[in-house]
A protein has these predicted regions:
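Glycosyltransferase donor-binding loop in the core domain
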Residues: 13-16, 127, 204
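Interdomain coupling/hinge region of P-loop NTPase helicase/AAA+ cores
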Residues: 1-73, 79-82, 138-144, 156-171, ...
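Generic detector of bulky aromatic hydrophobic side chains
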Residues: 23-24, 37, 76, 92, ...
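Short, flexible segments with low predicted structural confidence
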Residues: 52-53, 121-122, 164, 184-185
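Arginine-glycine-biased low-complexity disordered regions
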Residues: 33, 131-218
Length: 218
C-alpha cells in the first residue's frame, strides 16, 4: 500500500536548477489562477531566502521561514500565512516541523527530498481535512535515481508532467483577469471611480487607460 494520502495528486517535472523559479511561477499562474495556498520546500536557508525574495519581486505574496528565524518571527510569518495575507510560504524541513494548516492546496518540492520519509512527510501537509491536494516535485536529470527510490519505498503514484507553455500561462492569467473584472462590475461599487476615469481620459489615450486598468487589476 502507498504511504501517501489518496487525495493528493503527485506530479514530477524535470527541470534544470536554473529554470526552477520560472517553472514554479508558471505552475502557480496556470494551475490555480492565483487562488492556491502553496508550501514550497527548499534544502538550505539561503535557497529559501532567494526563492521567496524572487517570488516577491515578481509580484507574489510570498514569505520565508527557516532555522534562523526567532520564535516571534516564525509566529508572525505563520499568522500571515493562516490569515491569507501570504499565499506562498517557502521553508526548510526543520522550520516546517509541526506546521498544521489544513488550507494548503499545493506542496512544492523545489529541492527533491533527501529520502522517502521526508517526501511522505512533506506532501502530507496538503490533502488534509478531506480536501484534495497537489504535490509537485522538481527533479534534475541527475536526480532521477533518487526519485525512483522515493517511488519504490513510498509506493507513491507520481506522474510525470509537462510544464505549461508561456502562451498557456498567459491564457490562464487573462481568464483570471476577466473573472476579476466581472466580479468588480457585479459588485456595482465603481461609481466613485467615474470621475477619475473622466480625468484620465482627458489626459491620456483610451488605449493607455486600458493598459493602466489591466495592470492595476492584475
Amino acid at each position: 500500500d502507498t504511504l501517501t494520502a489518496p487525495k493528493i495528486s503527485q506530479i514530477v517535472y524535470e527541470v534544470r536548477n536554473a529554470d526552477k523559479l520560472d517553472a514554479l511561477c508558471r505552475l502557480i499562474d496556470f494551475g490555480s489562477e492565483g487562488t492556491g495556498i502553496y508550501l514550497v520546500f527548499c534544502h538550505t536557508k539561503r535557497e529559501v531566502d532567494e526563492v521567496s525574495q524572487h517570488l516577491r519581486l515578481r509580484g507574489y505574496e510570498s514569505d520565508a521561514m527557516h532555522g534562523d528565524y526567532t520564535q516571534a518571527q516564525r509566529e508572525a510569518v505563520l499568522k500571515k500565512f493562516r490569515d491569507g495575507r501570504c499565499d506562498i510560504l517557502v521553508a526548510t524541513d526543520v522550520a516546517a516541523r509541526g506546521l498544521d494548516i489544513s488550507s494548503i492546496s499545493h506542496v512544492v518540492n523545489y529541492s527533491i527530498p533527501q529520502n522517502p520519509e521526508s517526501y511522505v512527510h512533506r506532501i502530507g501537509r496538503t490533502g488534509r481535512a478531506g480536501r484534495e491536494g497537489v504535490a509537485i516535485t522538481f527533479v534534475t536529470p541527475r536526480e532521477d535515481r533518487q526519485l525512483r527510490l522515493i517511488q519504490s519505498v513510498s509506493k507513491a503514484q507520481i506522474k510525470r508532467g509537462k510544464l505549461p507553455s508561456r502562451e498557456e500561462v498567459l491564457g490562464a492569467r487573462l481568464t483570471g483577469l476577466e473573472e476579476k473584472i466581472n466580479e468588480f462590475i457585479d459588485d456595482k461599487h465603481f461609481d466613485k471611480f467615474l470621475g477619475l476615469a473622466d480625468r484620465l481620459l482627458a489626459k491620456l489615450d483610451p488605449k493607455d487607460v486600458e493598459m493602466i486598468v489591466v495592470g492595476t487589476v492584475t
